[in-house]
C-alpha cells in the first residue's frame, strides 16, 4: 500500500489533485433510508472495503447508509472544481490538508458549527498542526475536520549501524548525522552480499520534492512566506544554509547519484531490499515492513528483520518535519448534509480513528487515539506520534495550491547543481530561490 499510497497523496498535492472526485452522487436508497455520498482517495490497499468495514457499526446504529466512491488521483483538481461549480457534488469528501483553504475559497464547503465541533471534543481534541488546515487561515471559520495525519521519520538499518560502529543516538543532530554517514561510507558496507549506500534520497523527479526539502529549510530557520503572508522569504540565508546541508549529503557521496533519478517509492524499495542503510519516510512504511508479501508488504525483506525509526536530526532551530494528511468536508450543495456531519463525527471518534490508522498505516488526527497501545507501546510508531507534535505544515491560504508547484519546480532544479560540477555554488542556489520568490509574489499580489 505504501508504495502507491503516500506517493500518490503527495502527487496530488503537486499536480493540483489532493482533493476528491468521481461520479455524480445518487442519493437514492430504500424507503426512508438516508444515503450519504462520500468520495475518498485510495488510502489503503482496499480503500472501499476498509472504509465500509469501519462504518458498519455506524450504519447499524444510525440507519444512515454511506456510499463510498474511491477516486483516482491524477484528475482530482479539475473534477472537484467542475463538481463544485456545477453543483454535482457528493455530500462528504476527503480533502488533502493543504487544499482545504483553496476549496473553501471557492465557496464550495459548508461551515461546520462551533456546536458540532464541541460535540467532537473541540479543536483541542485534534493534533494542533492538523487543525491549522481546517479552514482558511485567519477566517475564524472551520470547513473541514481532520481525519488522519502523515508525518515523517528516519528509517534505519540497525545491523548497518552496528557494523559501522554507529549508535542511533549519533543520528540526533545535523553534525553527528553527517559524521555517522561518513562512518557508514567508510565502512564500505556489504550485508548479505548486497552493497549498501549510507543514505537514500529521491531527486527532482519525485512528487515529494518540496516535502523532502521543507524540513531542512525550517530547521535552519528559513521559511516560505512571511508571517503576514504578503511576501515570499524563501531566498533567506537560512533557507540557503538548510538546502546546502541536505544537498551536500549527496554531493559528498553518501547518496549514490543515480538515486536522484528515483522517486520515494523506489528509494523505499531499495531500503527494503538492503541497498541503502537509511531513508526518510512515513508510518505506512512500518505497515509495509510488518505485513506479509501476500498482503502487499515486505515482512521477509532484509530491512524488516533489522530496522528502527528515529526522528529527523536536529538543526540549528530544532527538529522539524513536514506533517500532512487529510480532512473531511461537507459540500454546500450536498443533499444530505446533516447525515454527512454524523458520519464525520463517527470517523473522528477515538476508536474509529484507531481502527482506520491500523488499516491504512497513517496516524490518527485525534490526540487521545495515540494513547492506544498500538502507538503508545510500539517505539517505532511512537517516533511518529512525537513527530506530529513538533512538525509543521504549509500556510492554509487559498493560493497555496498555485504556489506549491512553483516552489516544487524551483527546488527541483537544485538537484541539477548536485549532479553538475565539483562543488555546489550557494550563489546559484540563492538565484533559484530569488526566482521562486518573484514568481510566488506575483501570485500573492493578485489576491
Predicted regions and their residues:
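Long, aromatic- and glycine/proline-rich binding clefts that accommodate carbohydrate-like moieties
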Residues: 126-136, 304-311, 357-409, 413
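Conserved C-terminal helix/tail region of periplasmic/extracytoplasmic solute-binding proteins
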Residues: 65-66, 162, 390-447
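Helix-loop-helix "hinge/cap" segment bordering the ligand-binding cleft or interdomain interface
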Residues: 56, 63, 116-117, 136-212, ...
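Extracytoplasmic/periplasmic substrate-binding proteins
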Residues: 41, 53-54, 100-102, 211-215, ...
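Short, solvent-exposed loop/beta-turn-alpha elements that line the ligand-binding surface or hinge
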Residues: 110-126, 197-203, 220-241, 291-305, ...
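Extracytoplasmic "Venus flytrap"/periplasmic binding protein-like
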Residues: 53-129, 162-165, 172, 269-270, ...
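Short, low-complexity disordered leader/linker segments with a strong preference
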Residues: 1-37, 60-61, 116, 434, ...
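Hinge/lid segment of periplasmic solute-binding proteins
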Residues: 97-153, 192-197, 209-214, 219-221, ...
Amino acid at each position: 500500500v505504501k508504495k502507491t499510497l503516500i506517493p500518490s497523496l503527495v502527487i496530488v498535492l503537486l499536480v493540483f489533485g489532493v482533493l476528491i472526485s468521481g461520479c455524480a452522487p445518487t442519493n437514492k436508497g430504500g424507503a426512508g433510508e438516508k444515503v450519504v455520498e462520500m468520495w475518498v482517495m485510495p488510502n489503503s490497499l482496499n480503500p472501499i472495503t476498509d472504509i465500509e468495514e469501519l462504518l458498519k457499526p455506524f450504519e447499524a446504529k444510525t440507519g444512515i447508509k454511506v456510499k463510498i466512491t474511491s477516486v483516482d488521483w491524477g484528475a482530482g483538481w479539475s473534477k472537484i472544481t467542475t463538481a463544485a461549480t456545477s453543483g454535482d457534488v457528493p455530500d462528504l469528501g476527503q480533502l488533502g490538508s493543504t487544499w482545504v483553504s483553496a476549496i473553501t475559497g471557492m465557496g464550495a464547503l459548508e461551515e461546520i458549527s462551533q456546536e458540532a465541533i464541541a460535540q467532537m471534543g473541540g479543536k483541542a481534541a485534534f493534533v494542533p498542526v492538523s487543525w491549522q488546515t481546517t479552514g482558511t487561515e485567519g477566517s475564524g471559520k472551520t470547513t473541514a475536520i481532520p481525519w488522519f495525519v502523515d508525518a515523517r521519520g528516519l528509517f534505519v538499518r540497525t545491523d548497518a549501524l552496528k557494523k559501522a560502529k554507529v549508535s542511533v543516538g549519533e543520528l540526533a543532530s545535523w553534525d553527528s548525522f553527517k559524521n555517522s554517514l561518513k562512518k557508514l561510507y567508510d565502512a564500505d558496507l556489504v550485508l548479505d552480499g548486497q552493497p549498501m549506500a549510507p543514505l537514500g534520497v529521491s531527486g527532482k523527479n519525485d512528487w515529494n520534492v518540496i516535502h523532502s526539502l521543507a524540513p531542512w529549510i525550517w530547521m535552519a530557520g528559513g521559511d516560505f512566506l512571511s508571517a503576514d503572508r504578503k511576501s515570499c522569504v524563501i531566498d533567506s540565508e537560512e533557507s540557503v544554509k538548510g538546502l546546502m546541508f541536505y544537498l551536500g549529503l549527496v554531493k559528498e557521496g553518501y547518496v549514490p547519484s543515480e538515486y536522484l533519478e528515483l522517486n520515494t517509492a523506489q528509494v523505499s524499495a531499495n531500503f527494503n531490499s538492503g541497498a541503502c542503510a537509511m531513508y526518510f519516510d512515513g508510518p505506512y512504511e512500518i505497515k509495509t515492513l510488518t505485513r506479509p508479501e501476500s498482503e502487499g508488504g515486505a515482512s521477509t525483506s532484509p530491512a524488516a528483520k533489522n530496522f528502527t525509526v528515529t526522528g529527523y536530526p536536529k538543526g540549528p532551530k530544532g527538529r522539524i518535519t513536514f506533517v500532512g494528511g487529510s480532512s473531511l468536508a461537507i459540500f454546500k450543495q450536498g443533499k444530505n448534509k446533516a447525515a454527512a456531519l454524523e458520519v464525520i463525527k463517527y470517523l473522528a471518534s477515538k476508536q474509529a480513528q484507531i481502527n482506520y490508522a491500523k488499516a491504512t498505516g497513517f496516524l490518527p488526527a485525534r490526540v487521545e487515539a495515540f494513547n492506544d497501545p498500538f502507538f503508545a507501546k510500539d517505539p517505532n510508531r511512537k517516533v511518529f506520534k512525537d513527530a506530529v507534535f513538533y512538525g509543521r505544515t504549509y500556510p492554509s491560504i487559498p493560493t497555496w495550491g498555485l504556489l506549491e508547484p512553483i516552489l516544487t519546480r524551483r527546488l527541483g532544479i537544485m538537484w541539477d547543481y548536485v549532479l553538475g560540477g565539483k562543488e555546489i555554488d550557494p550563489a546559484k542556489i540563492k538565484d533559484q530561490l530569488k526566482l521562486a520568490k518573484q514568481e510566488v509574489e506575483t501570485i500573492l499580489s493578485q489576491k
